[in-house]
Curated annotation (Swiss-Prot):
Binding annotation for Zn(2+) 2: C47, C50, H64, C66
PROSITE patterns, sorted: UBX, ZF_AN1
Keyword check for Metal-binding: yes
Domain UBX: 278-356
Protein's name according to its UniProt entry: AN1-type zinc finger and UBX domain-containing protein DDB_G0268260
UniProt keyword Repeat, yes or no: yes
């Protein structure tokens, strides 16, 4: 076994440099600023007052003996009542006033829901309309604001004058009339009192004359009061302008037309429903064949007798002999003119039975040259077998 030679001095220096390079981590973390500690901390804590970094043990103000601990003050935060954002309050003196002032400044500048920043809306001046637009649309004639639907003069029945509230003039007239009536009543009462005083002074001399005069004066005063009351009642009535009356009449006509249209539409819908229901009616028809067998099918109310005939010809089991259809085994058969009539018109709803009466084709073929108006010639024949006559 060969013995390893001890490392030389330059080799030892190279190893020490390599170890220093591998284990040196000063560029990653931060050392604690406490002189007795100086721990390398990879997640240091920064002090708010002295702006220095410390380890976990010395992060508190008292642990690292912070010099700026006297500068610390209590901080108060108040939420905004609109956006719920926290607002810092700097001074503690007069908290109520400072909080109100800070909140008002915040709402005027930084608040999200600031009313001054919100877009304005313009309401339509038409009474029946309640829409509002973000753009002001004025009429050229009456110069009042309307929505996009009623912006044209024909849509809002423009009169060419600015719109005034309909109750403004009548209220003013009623107030003036009431004031005038009150003044007239006061003057009348004063005159009555004067007349009564004069009459009382002259009662000793002319009792009869004074009584007559008093009665006359009282009657006159009563008449005046009645007239004034009647005038006040008449004046209290609202005097509408002519344009508003026209608008009221037009609105009534418009609503009456709408009612008439609705009633007509309801009638049409009822008729359509009746037609639809009638078309959905089903008639159950049973057919007894010449051999006594029975076939049955559900036909619609609008189906004709020809469709019944086609069903019989495609589903019969009694052969190919000619037949006539009857409602009774000994009754009159249906004629050719009744082929295009519906089941409802023939009275076969809701349930009915038809009988197939056999016919002799040879007799009908021989008698076809004669002009006999017998019922058998007009009877309903399903079809004739042309090969039967050429035996």
């Amino acid at each position: 076994m060969q013995q390893q030679s001890p490392p030389t001095a330059p080799q030892q220096q190279q190893q020490q440099q390599r170890e220093r390079e591998t284990y040196q981590l000063d560029h990653i973390g931060v050392h604690c600023n406490v002189t007795d500690c100086r721990v390398l901390d990879f997640l240091p804590f920064n002090c708010d007052l002295c702006n220095l970094s410390f380890c976990m043990e010395h992060k508190g103000y008292e642990n690292h003996k912070c010099k700026n601990i006297e500068q610390r003050e209590n901080k108060i935060v108040h939420p905004c009542p609109v956006c719920n954002c926290l607002i810092k309050v700097d001074s503690l003196a007069n908290l109520d006033q400072t909080v109100r002032f800070i909140i008002s400044v915040h709402m005027d500048t930084d608040c999200k829901f600031n009313q001054s920043k919100a877009p304005k809306s313009f309401k339509c001046s038409l009474k029946t309309c309640k829409t509002s637009e973000f753009v002001e649309v004025k009429c050229d004639k009456c110069k009042s604001n309307y929505c996009l639907k009623h912006r044209f003069p024909t849509n809002h029945s423009c009169t060419g004058k600015p719109i005034i509230n309909s109750l403004s003039k009548p209220i003013n007239t009623t107030i003036n009339n009431n004031i005038n009536n009150n003044t007239n009543n006061i003057n009348n009462n004063i005159n009555n009192n004067k007349n009564n005083n004069n009459n009382n002074n002259n009662n000793n001399n002319n009792n009869n004359n004074n009584n007559n005069n008093n009665n006359n004066n009282n009657n006159n005063n009563n008449n005046n009061n009645n007239n004034n009351n009647n005038n006040s009642n008449n004046n209290n009535k609202l005097i509408y302008p002519g344009n508003i009356k026209k608008n009221i009449v037009e609105d009534k006509q418009y609503y009456l037309e709408q009612k008439n249209q609705k009633s007509e539409l309801q009638k049409l819908r009822e008729e359509q429903n009746q037609r639809y229901k009638s078309s959905e009616e089903i008639g159950e028809i049973g057919i007894i064949q010449t051999n006594g067998a029975r076939i049955q099918y559900d036909f619609m109310a609008t189906d004709t007798l020809r469709s019944v005939q086609k069903f019989i010809n495609s589903n019969r089991t009694d052969g190919t002999c000619s037949y006539a259809l009857c409602t009774q085994p000994t009754g009159n058969p249906f004629t050719l003119n009744q082929l295009n009539l519906s089941i409802r018109q023939l009275g076969l709803l809701p349930v009915s039975t038809l009988y197939m009466l056999p016919l002799d084709n040879s007799n009908n073929f021989n008698n076809s040259g004669n002009n006999n108006n017998n019922s058998s010639d007009q009877s309903l024949l399903s079809y004739l077998n042309p090969f039967k006559y050429f035996k």
